[in-house]
Amino acid sequence: MTDFTKDYKAVAEQFALEGEVTDIRPYGEGHINVTMLVTTDKKRYIMQKINTRVFPDTDALMRNICYVTEFLRKQGVETLNVIATKDGKNYLKGENCYRVYDFIENTITYQTVTDKEVFKNSGKAFGEFQNYLAAFDASLLTETIARFHDTPKRFADFKAALEADVK
Protein backbone atom coordinates (compact mmCIF):
# COMPACT_ATOMS: atom_id res chain seq x y z
CA MET A 1 0.00 0.00 0.00
CA THR A 2 1.44 3.39 -1.00
CA ASP A 3 1.63 6.40 1.32
CA PHE A 4 -1.07 8.00 -0.86
CA THR A 5 -3.39 5.06 -0.26
CA LYS A 6 -2.60 4.87 3.48
CA ASP A 7 -3.26 8.59 4.01
CA TYR A 8 -6.58 8.59 2.19
CA LYS A 9 -7.69 5.19 3.48
CA ALA A 10 -7.93 6.63 6.99
CA VAL A 11 -10.11 9.43 5.61
CA ALA A 12 -12.33 7.07 3.58
CA GLU A 13 -12.88 4.87 6.63
CA GLN A 14 -14.56 7.82 8.39
CA PHE A 15 -17.50 7.44 5.96
CA ALA A 16 -20.33 4.89 6.07
CA LEU A 17 -19.01 2.84 3.15
CA GLU A 18 -20.23 -0.64 2.27
CA GLY A 19 -17.38 -3.11 2.63
CA GLU A 20 -13.68 -2.82 3.37
CA VAL A 21 -11.50 -0.35 1.46
CA THR A 22 -9.27 -2.30 -0.93
CA ASP A 23 -7.89 0.47 -3.17
CA ILE A 24 -7.72 4.25 -3.47
CA ARG A 25 -6.28 6.04 -6.48
CA PRO A 26 -6.40 9.49 -8.09
CA TYR A 27 -9.34 9.83 -10.47
CA GLY A 28 -10.14 12.20 -13.32
CA GLU A 29 -8.67 15.52 -14.31
CA GLY A 30 -10.41 17.95 -11.99
CA HIS A 31 -9.08 21.47 -11.59
CA ILE A 32 -10.75 22.43 -8.31
CA ASN A 33 -10.92 19.47 -5.92
CA VAL A 34 -8.64 16.45 -5.46
CA THR A 35 -10.69 13.46 -6.59
CA MET A 36 -10.08 9.81 -5.74
CA LEU A 37 -11.71 6.55 -6.71
CA VAL A 38 -12.27 4.49 -3.56
CA THR A 39 -12.86 0.78 -4.11
CA THR A 40 -14.22 -1.52 -1.42
CA ASP A 41 -14.85 -5.23 -1.64
CA LYS A 42 -18.52 -4.37 -2.35
CA LYS A 43 -18.65 -1.20 -4.48
CA ARG A 44 -16.89 1.96 -5.68
CA TYR A 45 -17.08 5.55 -4.48
CA ILE A 46 -15.79 8.99 -5.42
CA MET A 47 -14.06 10.82 -2.57
CA GLN A 48 -13.09 14.46 -2.94
CA LYS A 49 -10.82 16.65 -0.90
CA ILE A 50 -12.76 19.91 -1.18
CA ASN A 51 -10.80 23.00 -2.19
CA THR A 52 -11.65 25.30 0.70
CA ARG A 53 -9.97 28.25 -1.01
CA VAL A 54 -12.64 28.07 -3.72
CA PHE A 55 -15.38 26.94 -1.30
CA PRO A 56 -14.57 28.44 2.12
CA ASP A 57 -18.16 27.90 3.31
CA THR A 58 -18.13 24.11 3.03
CA ASP A 59 -21.26 23.82 5.19
CA ALA A 60 -23.22 25.89 2.65
CA LEU A 61 -21.74 24.02 -0.32
CA MET A 62 -22.75 20.63 1.03
CA ARG A 63 -26.13 21.87 2.26
CA ASN A 64 -26.84 23.15 -1.28
CA ILE A 65 -25.85 19.80 -2.82
CA CYS A 66 -28.06 17.92 -0.36
CA TYR A 67 -31.06 20.21 -0.98
CA VAL A 68 -30.80 19.77 -4.75
CA THR A 69 -30.15 16.03 -4.75
CA GLU A 70 -32.94 15.37 -2.23
CA PHE A 71 -35.35 17.43 -4.36
CA LEU A 72 -34.39 15.50 -7.50
CA ARG A 73 -34.59 12.12 -5.74
CA LYS A 74 -38.14 12.90 -4.52
CA GLN A 75 -39.10 13.44 -8.18
CA GLY A 76 -37.69 10.03 -9.09
CA VAL A 77 -34.67 11.48 -10.88
CA GLU A 78 -31.41 9.52 -10.66
CA THR A 79 -28.91 11.81 -8.98
CA LEU A 80 -25.78 11.93 -6.85
CA ASN A 81 -25.94 10.03 -3.59
CA VAL A 82 -24.00 11.74 -0.81
CA ILE A 83 -22.47 9.20 1.57
CA ALA A 84 -22.58 10.35 5.19
CA THR A 85 -19.75 10.09 7.64
CA LYS A 86 -20.09 7.44 10.33
CA ASP A 87 -21.42 10.15 12.66
CA GLY A 88 -24.10 11.21 10.15
CA LYS A 89 -22.54 14.35 8.64
CA ASN A 90 -22.63 15.03 4.89
CA TYR A 91 -18.89 15.71 4.80
CA LEU A 92 -15.82 15.22 6.97
CA LYS A 93 -14.38 18.36 8.48
CA GLY A 94 -10.91 18.33 9.97
CA GLU A 95 -7.58 19.72 8.83
CA ASN A 96 -9.12 19.30 5.34
CA CYS A 97 -12.69 18.76 4.18
CA TYR A 98 -13.79 15.60 2.34
CA ARG A 99 -17.00 14.34 0.78
CA VAL A 100 -17.96 10.98 -0.69
CA TYR A 101 -20.50 10.02 -3.36
CA ASP A 102 -21.51 6.68 -4.80
CA PHE A 103 -19.51 6.12 -7.99
CA ILE A 104 -21.86 6.38 -10.97
CA GLU A 105 -20.97 3.53 -13.31
CA ASN A 106 -20.97 3.90 -17.11
CA THR A 107 -20.51 7.67 -17.12
CA ILE A 108 -17.96 9.90 -18.83
CA THR A 109 -16.64 13.35 -17.97
CA TYR A 110 -15.18 15.49 -20.74
CA GLN A 111 -12.51 18.14 -20.18
CA THR A 112 -12.87 19.39 -23.76
CA VAL A 113 -15.42 18.65 -26.46
CA THR A 114 -14.62 18.35 -30.16
CA ASP A 115 -17.59 16.21 -31.20
CA LYS A 116 -20.71 18.25 -32.06
CA GLU A 117 -22.99 15.40 -30.97
CA VAL A 118 -21.38 15.26 -27.51
CA PHE A 119 -21.72 19.04 -27.22
CA LYS A 120 -25.38 18.86 -28.27
CA ASN A 121 -26.10 16.07 -25.78
CA SER A 122 -24.42 17.99 -22.95
CA GLY A 123 -26.70 20.94 -23.71
CA LYS A 124 -29.74 18.67 -23.68
CA ALA A 125 -28.66 17.13 -20.37
CA PHE A 126 -28.16 20.58 -18.84
CA GLY A 127 -31.60 21.64 -20.10
CA GLU A 128 -33.17 18.52 -18.56
CA PHE A 129 -31.42 19.27 -15.27
CA GLN A 130 -32.77 22.84 -15.30
CA ASN A 131 -36.24 21.53 -16.13
CA TYR A 132 -36.14 19.09 -13.21
CA LEU A 133 -35.30 22.02 -10.92
CA ALA A 134 -38.05 24.33 -12.24
CA ALA A 135 -40.15 23.90 -9.07
CA PHE A 136 -37.17 23.97 -6.70
CA ASP A 137 -37.16 26.78 -4.13
CA ALA A 138 -33.84 28.45 -4.96
CA SER A 139 -34.15 30.67 -1.87
CA LEU A 140 -33.00 27.61 0.10
CA LEU A 141 -29.56 27.84 -1.51
CA THR A 142 -26.62 29.83 -0.22
CA GLU A 143 -24.30 31.63 -2.63
CA THR A 144 -20.94 29.86 -2.33
CA ILE A 145 -18.98 31.83 -4.96
CA ALA A 146 -19.91 35.52 -5.15
CA ARG A 147 -21.75 36.45 -8.38
CA PHE A 148 -20.93 33.10 -10.00
CA HIS A 149 -24.41 32.90 -11.56
CA ASP A 150 -24.54 36.59 -12.53
CA THR A 151 -24.80 36.03 -16.30
CA PRO A 152 -24.54 39.70 -17.36
CA LYS A 153 -21.37 40.13 -15.27
CA ARG A 154 -19.89 36.85 -16.53
CA PHE A 155 -20.63 37.83 -20.15
CA ALA A 156 -19.09 41.30 -19.65
CA ASP A 157 -16.00 39.64 -18.12
CA PHE A 158 -15.86 37.25 -21.09
CA LYS A 159 -16.07 40.12 -23.61
CA ALA A 160 -13.35 42.04 -21.74
CA ALA A 161 -11.11 38.96 -21.81
CA LEU A 162 -11.68 38.58 -25.56
CA GLU A 163 -10.80 42.22 -26.18
CA ALA A 164 -7.68 41.94 -24.02
CA ASP A 165 -6.48 38.85 -25.92
CA VAL A 166 -4.40 40.69 -28.50
CA LYS A 167 -2.16 38.56 -30.71
Regions found by a protein language model. Name each.
Residues 163-167:
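Loop-centered beta-sheet repeat module
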Residues 24-46, 50-160:
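Conserved ATP-binding subdomain of kinase catalytic cores across diverse folds
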